[in-house]
Swiss-Prot record:
It is an enzyme of class 3 (hydrolase). Substrate binds at R67, S68, G69, N80, L84, I85, D86, M94. This is Deoxyuridine 5'-triphosphate nucleotidohydrolase. The gene is dut. It comes from the Bacteria. Its EC number is 3.6.1.23. Pfam families: dUTPase.
Length: 148
């Protein structure tokens, strides 16, 4: 799949999104910063990537997801948990960054901060019904299938 990518900050030509390995699902996104940013515990920051994409096809969307190592080792996750990029969005990709850890974290310019995953999308329509056909689960919700 070929994506249209717009470079909004010329410095990002040297840091284009790429897969770290042949089996990677996510393309690494980097922080397009002029200087380091210090995130104290509980702080949030909206970090630019210097890039924009246009998927164009409504059968696809992109997800911005955290990098597992940053979350596990440093408590750096996404403030919005998952960033959803719609197929018709053409603006800059921004990374909502949250330090949920216990110590300060310094985010350096061009550091890998998140990952971009392209996913298929089905746009549903609704069929209004009075009742559903019976299922084994029914309306059983949280914890209804047991613990083990």
């Amino acid at each position: 799949m070929k994506l249209d990518l717009k470079i909004l900050d010329a410095r990002m030509r040297d840091y284009l999104p790429k897969y770290a390995t042949t089996g990677s699902a996510g393309l690494d996104l980097r922080a397009c910063l002029d200087a380091p940013v210090t995130l104290k515990p509980g702080d949030t920051a909206l970090v630019p990537t210097g890039l924009a994409i246009h998927l164009a096809d409504p059968g696809y969307a992109a997800l911005i997801l955290p990098r597992s190592g940053l979350g596990h080792k440093h408590g750096i996750v996404l403030g919005n948990l998952v960033g959803l990029i719609d197929s018709d969005y053409q603006g800059e990709l921004m990374i909502s960054t949250w330090n949920r850890g216990q110590t300060e974290f310094v985010l350096n310019p061009f550091e890998r901060l998140a990952q971009l995953v392209i996913v298929p999308v089905v746009q549903a329509t609704f069929n209004i019904v009075g009742d559903f056909a019976q299922s084994d689960r029914g309306a059983g919700g949280f914890g209804s299938t047991g613990r083990h």
